[in-house]
């Protein structure tokens, strides 16, 4: 099973790696939500390394890839895409009026960085595979 895990926006909590390890030991695979927008990651992108080494998944926000959350989030999102570390490209649509579910711009930018097939997999095939694992 996959668990979408969102850290506080200001920082990665102390000992968060212990929590993700605890989840992994119980067969729950953490997927870290929009790490590119976390202030702690923005200050030190290497903060993600322990989670990546553990095997945690990463969900990056499409608007970040397109620059909608500023240049720092965009740069980190692009770097994660180029390194092949992004599992899913998503919308982070909490409200249809305030933050609608639009993937288009981010998907186009991702395709320029990693190619059409890989970008498409981040929004179609991979999410589908994860969902199938939960709802079989």
Feature roles, as predicted:
Residues 1-59:
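Extended substrate/RNA-proximal surfaces in nucleic-acid metabolism proteins
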Residues 17-20, 43-49, 71-81, 103-106:
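Charged helix-capping and loop-helix junction motifs
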Residues 34, 92, 127:
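Conserved, mostly hydrophobic/aromatic
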Residues 37-41, 65-68, 94-99:
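Active-site environment of divalent metal-dependent phosphoester hydrolases
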Residues 50-58, 76-90:
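Structural recognition of alpha->loop->beta junctions
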Residues 85-101:
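Short acidic/histidine-rich active-site segments
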Residues 103-136:
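Mid-to-C-terminal alpha-helical segments outside catalytic/metal-binding sites
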């Amino acid at each position: 099973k996959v668990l979408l895990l969102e850290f506080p926006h200001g920082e990665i909590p102390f000992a968060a790696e212990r929590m993700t390890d605890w989840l992994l030991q119980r067969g729950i695979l953490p997927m870290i939500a929009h790490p590119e927008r976390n202030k702690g990651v923005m200050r030190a992108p290497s903060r993600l390394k322990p989670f990546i080494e553990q095997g945690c998944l990463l969900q990056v926000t499409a608007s970040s890839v397109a620059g909608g959350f500023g240049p720092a989030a965009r740069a980190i999102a692009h770097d994660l895409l180029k390194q092949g570390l992004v599992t899913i490209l998503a919308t982070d649509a909490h409200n249809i009026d305030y933050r609608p579910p639009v993937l288009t711009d981010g998907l186009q930018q991702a395709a320029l960085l990693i190619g059409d097939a890989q970008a498409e997999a981040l929004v179609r095939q991979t999410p589908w595979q994860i969902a199938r694992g939960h709802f079989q």
